[in-house]
Amino acid sequence: MSEAPAATPSKPRVLVADDEQVIANTLAIILNQNGFEARAVYSGEKAIESLDSFQPDMLISDVIMTGMTGIEAAIATQKKMPNCKILLFSGQAATADLLEKARQDGHEFEILAKPVHPSDLLAKLRG
C-alpha cells in the first residue's frame, strides 16, 4: 500500500489594509513573494468585508484611513476572528491618541512606524 502524500502546509494569509493603494499593493506583493498569501484592500470597511471570504491569519493595517480607522478595523476583526493577529502601522503623530483610546477600552495592538522596511515587516510576521 502506498502512503498518501503529506499535506502541503498552507501559506499564512495576510490581509493588508491601507487607503494608499500603492502602499497596500506593494506590501501585498512583497508578502506574496516571501511565502505568504496576501491580499490588499483599500479601507477598513473593505478589510472587514473580506474577512469571511479570505479568512486571514493576520491583518496588517494603516491606522489613519478615510472612513473606518485601522484601529476600528482591528477591533472588529478581533471580535469576528479572535485568533487573527493584528499589526498596525502609521506615519502620523495623531496615532498615539487613537491607540491610547483603544488601550483604555482593553485593546492592545503592536504598531510599526511608516515607512515600514520590508525586512522589518517580514521579521515581525515570522517572529
What is each stretch, according to the model?
Residues 35-42, 50, 112:
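Short hydrophobic/Thr-rich beta-strand motif most characteristic of the beta2 strand and flanking loop
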Residues 54-60, 87:
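Active-site beta3 strand of CheY-like receiver
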Residues 24, 66:
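The feature encodes the CheY-like receiver
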Residues 1-13, 117-127:
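Non-catalytic signal-transmission and effector/linker regions of two-component phosphorelay proteins
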Residues 42-46, 69-73:
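Acidic catalytic/metal-coordinating carboxylates
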Residues 25-33:
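Charged docking surfaces used in two-component/phosphorelay signaling
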Residues 89-91:
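Hydrophobic/aromatic residues positioned on beta-strands within the core alpha/beta folds
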Residues 20, 63-64:
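The short loop immediately C-terminal to the conserved phospho-acceptor aspartate in CheY-like receiver
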